[in-house]
Regions:
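Carbohydrate-associated surface elements
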Residues: 111, 130
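Acidic anion/phosphate-binding donor-loop and adjacent secondary structure
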Residues: 131-147
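Nucleotide-sugar donor phosphate/pyrophosphate-binding loop at the beta->alpha transition
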Residues: 65-67, 75-97, 101
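Short hydrophobic beta-strand element within catalytic cores of glycosyltransferases
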Residues: 252-255
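Short alpha-helical donor nucleotide-sugar binding micro-motif in glycosyltransferases
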Residues: 214-215, 222-227
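Conserved acidic donor-binding segment of nucleotide-sugar-dependent glycosyltransferases
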Residues: 267-268, 272-279, 288-293
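Conserved donor-binding/catalytic core segment of Leloir-type glycosyltransferases
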Residues: 148-174
Length: 335
């Protein structure tokens, strides 16, 4: 894109997907060069990433307003109680600092705003992020996939394969179903993929669970559009993009009632909301939708009606422009 410059600093990952700046000469040279830049606003996203703390330090050192955008609605969930405890400790120190000292905090859901209040004691403005509605509307189901699995009812999951997404519960639910008339698509990649494949082997589901890995957005969407039911079994969410996209694809949705999911679908006629970590309930709802195709179709239509007007990039952009312009103007007045 024009007028966008990406600067990538060297990093290492003590925990997968949570990079820390590498204290190398290259990193410190880049920090020094950033002193020449004259931004009007600094923006950080999600308080438990080290980049948010780095953005805060840079903004305060330069006297530049910091806008923090929070996506999380709970403490980070890790595979292991020790990691989860350490993550919570990090949040109560460094996450709190980011949220308390940012000039403005924006949350992408009411659930995220509630968590900001809980962790830091301050209020956050809610701006729902938009969706690529036009692209989703124009995308057609992948015809090769349609032909390959004709006659099967298709269940789909789309998202990162990390512990917090609860994908193990979906595999466990499929094992409980013992149905041969379905196939399940896992669209996305991540550190959980190897373990999930072992689970499918253990439960003899190798021919019923298809792993697509990471795909370009439109290709992934084409696969998603072939599905009859979309399952989002997450343990924690801010505002789940996958649920929003599934609704815009007019799919019947089974999702865990966590974070901002209830702000996408209500669970009353537009999909099923269930508690997290309950694979038996996932199996129960899938079985119901398999046996009631007409209701499955109606749930998808209702979900689309709920979401199509609510998540608009035009509306979100207007809010952001108003906030950023106001902060930049205020900064100029106080120079």
């Amino acid at each position: 894109a024009k007028n966008i410059r990406v600067i990538r600093f060297p990093a290492w990952e003590p925990i997968h997907n949570y990079p820390l700046p590498s204290p190398s000469p290259k990193f410190f040279r880049m920090l020094f060069l950033l002193r020449r830049e004259r931004p009007d606003i600094v923006i950080s996203r999600t308080r438990f990433f080290a980049t948010s703390l780095l953005a805060l330090a840079y903004a305060k050192a330069r006297g530049i307003p910091l806008v923090h955008i929070e996506h999380g609605s709970d403490y980070a969930s890790f595979n292991g109680s020790i990691k989860t405890f350490l993550g919570k400790c990090y949040d109560h120190v460094f996450g709190w600092i980011v949220l308390r000292f940012a000039d403005r905090v924006i949350a992408n859901s009411q659930a995220s705003a509630s968590f900001v209040k809980k962790l830091s004691g301050r209020d956050a403005m809610v701006i729902y992020r938009g969706t690529k509605t036009q692209i989703i509307e124009q995308c057609v189901p992948d015809q090769k996939t349609v032909e390959a699995y004709r006659g099967k009812t298709i269940i789909a999951f789309i998202g990162r394969l990390i512990d917090g997404k609860g994908t193990r519960d979906l595999i466990t639910a499929l094992a409980r179903l013992e149905r041969t008339d379905i196939v399940t698509f896992i669209i996305g990649g991540g550190p959980e993929e190897a373990h999930l494949k072992k689970m499918t082997t253990k439960y003899r589901l190798e021919n019923q669970v298809i792993f697509f890995g990471n795909l370009p957005f439109e290709k992934a969407l084409g696969i998603l559009k072939t599905a009859d039911v979309v399952v989002n079994p997450s343990y924690t969410e801010g505002l789940p993009t996958s649920v929003t996209e599934a609704a815009l694809c007019r799919k019947a949705i089974i999702a865990t009632d966590v974070g901002g999911t209830r702000e996408v679908i209500s669970g009353s006629g537009d999909g099923f909301l269930i508690p997290p970590r309950r694979p038996e309930l996932i199996a129960e709802k899938i079985r119901y939708l398999l046996d009631h195709p007409d209701e499955r179709e109606q749930l998808g239509k209702n979900a689309y009606a709920e979401v199509s007007e609510k998540f608009s990039w035009d509306r979100a952009s207007d809010h952001y422009i108003e906030i950023l312009s106001g902060l930049a103007e205020n900064k100029k007045k106080h120079r």
